[in-house]
């Protein structure tokens, strides 16, 4: 057909190697988004070729004397039968990409797009920038976390490309082959000239032709729907779909619905659902043909001409090509086997079989490389930045180092953020315990997806033993924490269930705060022992009742101060016995009555006065009545008032859960933020006031003046509040808006928080320059500079600049 029958059509060249190998026959299969593979049968007059020297060598198989053919690397070599003069050899020719199938890996990629991941892997295999090309029409998002898990590099690359709808094909020359990635039809080149269709009549045509061509139609999915869930936008319905154009032929409604769709915004979901539909329908119309045209290469457009069905005379995208060639004329003698062992009448020349789709139908690689699934759970170690003992984000997520991850550095970049499962999680309530750096945790994977890890628990190991030795303490249930940073302290709740030794043990390393909104009832079946190392403060807003059924023994090592606002009533069943080492001084503002039913005695210095039913007896060396002298005096009272107890640490209640309605798009409820207070004590309000330094102050709440905070101002008159105190004051203002008061000498001022916008001071000066006080409903301030921030904020409901323009 191309050359006389006794001339060879096919030839093999090996880079950097002189040889006498001749192509006896070959077969090959190539397709879009898959490495090609050609099996070559060769003969040589040399019976001892060095097979190792052939391996991995670039080679070019020419189909025609003009140089059309396939370039690749020698992937396999074998020596076959030997005759008197010729020895058979077999070579396998593949692209460089095929070598990726021989390297399996488990690794993590973070914040990279699919093209970036693919390029990284290619260059690790020596496929450099001049050997591959990306011709993409779409910008692909970064994958925050992408795992290659127990799969070959080739499987991983093909899987990622198929998930995104990216295809690849090869372009060949005698010196190299080029790997081209694309995502639309424009990336596919067109073959040089049309190829005529000539029905296979058994005759040999003058030019390469298409001998057979058929078209089949198949039922395929007609619409796709994808849905996903984003925990950062839990009330947002993430769903996207795609269907054929309205003018497409009517077909049954066949939907492909999938969850999770692996997207976090609708635009991305729309693209993925569109690519999925294009993938389903890529081969709905599939052409199949047979030809002897050696120019056919997958990933190229073939133009068919002279077909009796006119609409088929068009461009067709070659998706797969099966090549076959034989040239028995290279044999100059018989060897053990010959080339006639064929099941058909093809004995010599070149032929191919191909699959093709219409040019306007987008090609998308099928999902033939499923994502590996993680079977069961794994363990990992919690990681963080150097020096950090606890590392988490606003959701309590942590990072981990997987045992299989060879590239991770065990730091705050070793994985994505992993959510931590809790036994209870509500809207501002529930339970949370953050796994700490160094802890070994149990990791599950949502639907077995290695890209979606989730911490489900913690486990002990030899280097991190349990709090109490086991099994000696197997009856103990313990929750024990560790002070951070640095350790050297702990909080603990321990429950001992050993028979006869049952116990609940609580240890607080520093403070213990309790808030009980209603009653507290405590019953102690035996003894109770309280030891307070420093002061004890109690305040009862109503009555206090004590009943002691036995004796009461109280010892005070220093003074006892008792202040009773009204009357004190003391009832003694038998006797009142009091002894003072030096003095007893009783003083009444108006009168004092000492009454005894039978006898009253006053005794001092050997003298006494006794009053009883028989009369009054006065006994002493000398009795003076109205004879001068003066009464003795007492020391007088020097009462000290008690300090009020500090308030227990407070928090805000959670909020009821609101079920999400399917199909609705609602925003997240606004979270209540904490105020940050900046308070200064002054003799008068406003910029003209002088700061009151080192002045005691109290912040109280409600009519009963419940103490919230107290302290002393600093050298600038400011209230120095730490984070805990800021939170306590913020919570008090949220619980009782408008009923929280700052009290200091001569002042009682309501605390009414407002949000201070950035740049407020500059805005305030602008308001003063425009005499903004006139807008306060005619209530002019006593001094022009007096602070009215709360009022000004309420006046300006919109943009301050717009408000100024309106006033001007």
From Swiss-Prot:
UniProt keyword list: Secreted
Description of the deletion phenotype: Deletion leads to a complete loss of PldA secretion.
Keyword Magnesium applies: no
SUPFAM superfamilies attached to this UniProt entry: gp5 N-terminal domain-like, Phage fibre proteins, Phage tail proteins
GO cellular component: extracellular region; type VI protein secretion system complex
Family: Belongs to the VgrG protein family.
Protein name: Type VI secretion system spike protein VgrG4b
Species whose genome carries this gene: Pseudomonas aeruginosa (strain ATCC 15692 / DSM 22644 / CIP 104116 / JCM 14847 / LMG 12228 / 1C / PRS 101 / PAO1)
Taxonomy of the source species: Bacteria, Pseudomonadati, Pseudomonadota, Gammaproteobacteria, Pseudomonadales
């Amino acid at each position: 057909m191309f050359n006389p029958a006794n001339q060879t059509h096919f030839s093999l060249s090996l880079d950097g190697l002189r040889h006498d190998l001749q192509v006896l026959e070959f077969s090959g299969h190539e397709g879009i988004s898959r490495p090609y593979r050609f099996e070559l049968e060769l003969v040589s007059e040399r019976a001892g070729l060095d097979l190792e020297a052939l391996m991995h060598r670039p080679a070019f198989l020419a189909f025609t004397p003009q140089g059309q053919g396939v370039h690749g690397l020698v992937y396999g070599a074998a020596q076959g039968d030997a005759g008197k003069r010729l020895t058979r050899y077999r070579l396998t020719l593949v692209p460089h990409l095929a070598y990726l199938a021989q390297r399996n890996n488990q690794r993590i990629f973070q914040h990279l797009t699919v093209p970036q991941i693919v390029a990284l892997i290619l260059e690790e295999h020596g496929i450099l920038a001049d050997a591959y090309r990306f011709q993409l029409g779409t910008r692909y998002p970064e994958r925050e976390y992408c795992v290659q898990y127990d799969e070959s590099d080739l499987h991983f690359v093909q899987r990622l490309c198929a998930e995104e709808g990216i295809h690849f094909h090869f372009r060949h020359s005698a010196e190299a082959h080029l790997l081209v990635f694309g995502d639309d039809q424009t990336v596919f080149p067109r073959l040089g000239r049309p190829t005529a269709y000539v029905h296979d009549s058994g005759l040999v045509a003058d030019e390469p032709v298409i001998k057979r061509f058929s078209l089949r139609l198949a039922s395929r999915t007609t619409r796709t729907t994808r849905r996903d869930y984003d925990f950062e936008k839990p009330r947002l319905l993430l769903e996207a779909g795609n269907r054929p154009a309205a003018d497409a032929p009517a077909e049954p409604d066949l939907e492909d619905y999938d969850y999770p769709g692996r997207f976090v915004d609708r635009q991305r979901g729309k693209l993925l659902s569109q690519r999925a539909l294009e993938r389903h329908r890529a081969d709905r119309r599939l052409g199949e043909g047979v030809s002897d045209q050696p120019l056919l290469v997958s990933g190229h457009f073939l133009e068919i001409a002279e077909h009796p069905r006119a609409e088929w005379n068009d461009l067709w995208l070659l998706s797969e090509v099966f090549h076959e060639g034989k040239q028995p004329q290279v044999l100059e003698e018989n060897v053990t086997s010959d080339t006639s062992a064929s099941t058909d009448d093809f004995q010599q020349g070149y032929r191919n079989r191909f699959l093709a789709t219409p040019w306007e139908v987008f090609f998308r690689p099928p999902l033939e490389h499923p994502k590996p699934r993680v079977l069961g759970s794994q363990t990992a170690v919690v990681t963080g930045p150097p020096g950090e003992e606890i590392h988490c984000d606003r959701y309590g997520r942590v990072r981990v180092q997987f045992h299989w991850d060879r590239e991770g550095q065990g730091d705050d970049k070793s994985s994505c953020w992993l959510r931590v499962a809790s036994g209870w999680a509500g809207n501002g309530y529930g339970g949370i315990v953050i796994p700490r750096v160094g802890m070994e945790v149990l990791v599950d994977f949502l639907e077995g997806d290695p890209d979606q890890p989730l911490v489900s628990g913690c486990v002990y190991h030899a280097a991190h033993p349990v709090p109490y030795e086991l099994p000696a303490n197997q009856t103990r249930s313990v929750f024990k924490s560790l002070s951070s940073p640095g350790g050297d302290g702990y909080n603990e709740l321990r429950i001992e269930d050993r028979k006869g030794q049952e116990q609940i043990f609580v240890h607080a390393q520093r403070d213990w705060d309790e808030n009980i909104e209603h009653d507290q009832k405590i019953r102690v079946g035996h003894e109770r022992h309280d030891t307070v190392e420093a002061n004890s403060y109690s305040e009862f807003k109503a009555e206090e009742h004590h009943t002691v059924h036995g004796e009461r023994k109280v010892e005070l090592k220093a003074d006892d101060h008792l202040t009773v606002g009204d009357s004190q009533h003391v009832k003694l069943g038998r006797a009142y016995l009091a002894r003072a080492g030096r003095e007893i001084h009783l003083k009444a503002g108006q009168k004092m009555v000492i009454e005894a039913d039978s006898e009253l005695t006053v005794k001092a210095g050997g003298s006494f006065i006794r009053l009883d039913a028989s009369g009054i007896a006065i006994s002493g060396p000398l009795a003076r009545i109205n004879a001068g002298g003066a009464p003795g005096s007492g020391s007088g009272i020097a009462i000290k008032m008690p300090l009020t107890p500090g308030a227990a640490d407070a928090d805000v209640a959670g909020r009821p859960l609101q079920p999400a309605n399917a199909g609705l798009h609602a925003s997240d409820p606004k979270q209540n933020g904490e105020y940050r207070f900046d308070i200064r004590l002054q003799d008068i309000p406003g910029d003209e006031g002088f700061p009151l330094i080192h002045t005691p102050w109290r912040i109280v709440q409600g009519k009963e003046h419940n103490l919230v905070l107290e302290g002393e101002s600093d050298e600038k008159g400011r209230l120095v509040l730490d984070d805990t105190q800021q939170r306590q004051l913020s919570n008090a203002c949220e619980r009782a808006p408008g009923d929280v008061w700052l009290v200091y000498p001569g002042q009682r001022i309501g605390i009414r928080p407002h949000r201070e916008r950035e740049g407020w001071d500059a805005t305030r000066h602008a308001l003063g320059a425009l005499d903004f006080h006139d807008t306060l409903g005619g209530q002019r301030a006593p001094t022009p500079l007096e602070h009215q921030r709360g009022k000004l904020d309420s006046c300006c409901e919109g943009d301050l600049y717009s408000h100024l323009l309106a006033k001007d």
